[in-house]
Every structure is written in structure tokens, then in C-alpha cells.
């Protein structure tokens, strides 16, 4: 008789060093692991990946829905498609929204994965790594046809072109994969913000070096070290015979209140890992204020140049949050219109959520540091 396994998992989502918003979402539930990489303008990507978390979390919380697991894994993208279609109908600016889906669930000694898009699931066993999923991209089709190499794909101009995604328009049929799993196997789910800048060999080295918690942080830091051009979401799970009940964790866009309140028809899980900005929803833009901000930006730039204070600004440093983590910024903690007077220079493997609410509020304002 096969032995039932359970998983201990950790995850983290980071906005990266280039993007302004995090369109990735992640979920660690009682049974499910999930990474969703949203896409689309006007914050639609955040809503698409957040919707995916809400739908998967509902299935995760319902034991009856897990009885016929294969059919549920096929049904999940259909439900997400319906919700995205409703969201687009309510607001036409959301047209073009979409998301990837890589959801994994442990059932006794089997791992079942439902996959759409180019987020990935990996298996690490006996210090070897293998991909459970296959990227549904134009680039992957070229690689399989031996038209380009994996190395050439890294710099290909169409490397981000998806052949499959959940978009609220066409019905997506996920690829369902089932593999036998063993104690001490590790499962890794991630968005392409990791795999575009960190190789499989580097991922394996890090996962073998750290436990599942340390591996998550080390992988995120490696992606940031390599430029962090995209949002990065990583979940690592350690499979054990010992019964283990995970606390529910929501990552990235789905953890932000400003995204949840735009999806009033969906029920989100109560999680232990709220994003720091969850109590500070973004303010709606005001046209006249935006115009004023742009005019003021150019005026301020002229003043800065005339006063010769650029050198002074470059010598200022402060501590604040960069996504989920603490970071040091060079410059001053202010911006007018599109002009920011600071940039992140170092991110630390220390999550903001460990701070008290009072300390988080202080951190949001920035803590001046000596140069």
C-alpha cells in the first residue's frame, strides 16, 4: 500500500527591480500550491492572478471538491475564465487581462499539476532537477523543433509570447500531469521572473544547499542579483511522511487589499501573510492633479539643476520596503508625477510582515540612514 505524503511549504513574491506593480500571485493552502503570473494593462494583470488565487483557494477549502481531483483540475481554468470575462464586461479597460496557472496538489503519493502558460513546476529528487511542466510559448516550440537552443532563447525578441493563457475570452484546457512522489522530494513552483534570469542548474544548486524556507529567499535574491527585470514568485515544498498542516499563505497581488476590493464577487482566504500595502490602497488618480504633477515635475527638475543639488541627493540614503522585504534606497523618499528621486540599491532577506503595524507605518514613510 502506498504511503500518503504531506508537504511543508514556504513562498515569497517580489516586485523585482524594474516593474512598478506586482502582477504575480501565489497561494499555499491545505492541499494546493499555486503560482499565477498576471498580464494586462490598467492593473488588470493583478486582478487576473488574484482571481486565480480566489478560485483555487475555494477548491482547496472544500474536501468534497477534492474527491474527483482530475475533473476539478480541468474545471478550475474554466471557472477563472468565466470570472475574468465578467470582470472585462464590467470594465472594458480590463480587456487583454490574463494569467498563467500552475497549480499542484498532493494526493497520497501522487502529485497532480494543472498547467497553463509559462510559469513552471519543478521536481527535485536525489539532488537532480526535472521540469514537471512545459512552457506553452512560441520559444518552447522553436526549441522543440531544434530551430534555436535554450541559450539562444534567453535573448530572443519573442521569448515572452504565450501560446496559452487564461484570458477570459477563449477556453483554456490545462495540461494535467500526475507523477509519483517520495519522501524528501522537493517541489518548486515559480513565475518566469525567476526562470528568465536564473538557470535550472542554479536553481538546483540553491535548493540542494538550503531547506525549503531558505531556498525561497535565496532564489528570490539570486533573481534580484541578476537584474530582477520582472516580478518574481517562488514556492518550495518539502514532501514528508509526517502529517503536516500548512497555514494558508497568499502571496503577491492577491494579498493586496486594493486588488481584492476590485473583485467584490470573490471570496479570498484568510491568510497569515498580508502584504504591507494591504491597509494602504492606492488612491484614484485625479486628472487635474496629474496635470499639475507633471508641470511641477519639470519645474522642480529645473530648480534642482539650478541649485546644483543632484550631488546632494545621490549621497542620501533611507530604509523602506521593496515589495515584501526591507531595502536600502539611494536618494530621497519623494516623487512628483513620474519623477522619483530614489532607487533601490540593496534588498535584504528580511520580510516586512515581521514588524509591528506601527513599525510598518514608519517604514512606509522611509527611515533616513547615514551614507
Please give the residue ranges for each predicted region.
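PP2C/PPM-type serine/threonine phosphatase catalytic domain
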Residues: 1-296, 300
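Short structural boundary motif marking the start of a folded domain
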Residues: 5-10, 315-317, 324
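Loop/turn residues immediately N-terminal
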Residues: 119, 193, 315, 325-326
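Alpha-helical transmembrane segments
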Residues: 299, 303-307
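Aromatic-capped interface at the extracytoplasmic side
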Residues: 306-321
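Short extracytoplasmic/periplasmic juxtamembrane "stem" segments immediately C-terminal to an N-terminal membrane anchor
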Residues: 320-339
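Extracytoplasmic/periplasmic/luminal assembly and interaction segments
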Residues: 336-371
Amino acid at each position: 500500500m502506498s504511503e500518503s505524503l504531506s508537504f511543508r511549504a514556504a513562498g515569497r513574491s517580489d516586485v523585482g527591480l524594474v516593474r512598478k506593480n506586482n502582477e504575480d500571485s501565489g497561494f499555499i493552502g491545505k492541499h494546493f500550491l499555486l503560482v499565477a503570473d498576471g498580464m494586462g494593462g490598467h492593473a488588470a494583470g493583478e486582478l487576473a492572478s488574484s482571481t486565480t488565487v480566489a478560485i483555487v483557494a475555494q477548491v482547496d477549502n472544500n474536501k468534497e471538491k477534492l474527491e474527483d481531483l482530475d475533473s476539478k483540475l480541468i474545471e478550475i481554468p474554466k471557472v477563472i475564465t468565466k470570472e475574468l470575462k465578467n470582470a472585462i464586461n464590467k470594465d472594458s479597460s480590463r480587456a487583454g487581462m490574463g494569467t498563467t496557472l500552475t497549480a499542484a496538489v498532493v494526493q497520497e503519493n501522487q502529485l497532480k499539476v494543472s498547467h497553463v502558460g509559462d510559469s513552471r513546476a519543478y521536481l527535485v529528487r536525489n539532488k537532480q532537477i526535472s521540469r514537471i511542466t512545459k512552457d506553452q510559448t512560441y520559444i518552447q516550440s522553436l526549441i522543440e523543433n531544434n530551430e534555436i537552443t535554450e541559450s539562444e532563447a534567453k535573448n530572443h525578441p519573442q521569448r515572452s509570447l504565450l501560446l496559452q493563457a487564461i484570458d477570459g475570452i477563449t477556453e483554456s484546457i490545462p495540461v494535467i500531469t500526475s507523477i509519483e512522489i517520495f519522501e524528501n522530494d522537493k517541489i518548486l513552483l515559480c513565475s518566469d521572473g525567476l526562470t528568465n534570469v536564473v538557470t535550472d542548474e542554479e536553481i538546483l544548486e540553491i535548493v540542494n544547499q538550503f531547506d525549503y524556507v531558505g531556498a525561497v529567499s535565496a532564489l528570490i535574491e539570486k533573481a534580484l542579483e541578476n537584474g530582477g527585470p520582472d516580478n518574481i514568485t517562488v514556492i518550495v515544498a518539502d514532501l514528508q511522511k509526517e502529517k503536516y498542516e500548512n497555514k494558508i499563505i497568499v502571496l503577491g497581488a492577491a494579498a493586496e487589499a486594493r486588488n481584492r476590493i476590485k473583485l467584490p464577487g470573490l471570496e479570498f482566504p484568510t491568510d497569515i501573510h498580508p502584504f504591507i500595502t494591504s491597509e494602504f490602497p492606492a488612491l484614484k488618480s485625479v486628472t487635474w492633479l496629474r496635470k499639475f504633477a507633471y508641470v511641477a515635475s519639470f519645474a522642480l527638475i529645473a530648480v534642482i539643476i539650478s541649485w546644483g543639488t543632484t550631488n546632494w541627493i545621490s549621497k542620501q540614503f533611507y530604509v523602506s520596503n521593496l515589495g515584501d522585504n526591507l531595502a536600502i534606497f539611494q536618494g530621497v523618499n519623494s516623487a512628483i508625477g513620474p519623477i522619483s528621486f530614489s532607487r533601490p540599491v540593496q534588498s535584504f532577506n528580511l520580510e516586512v510582515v515581521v514588524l509591528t503595524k506601527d513599525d510598518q507605518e514608519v517604514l512606509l514613510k522611509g527611515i533616513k540612514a547615514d551614507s
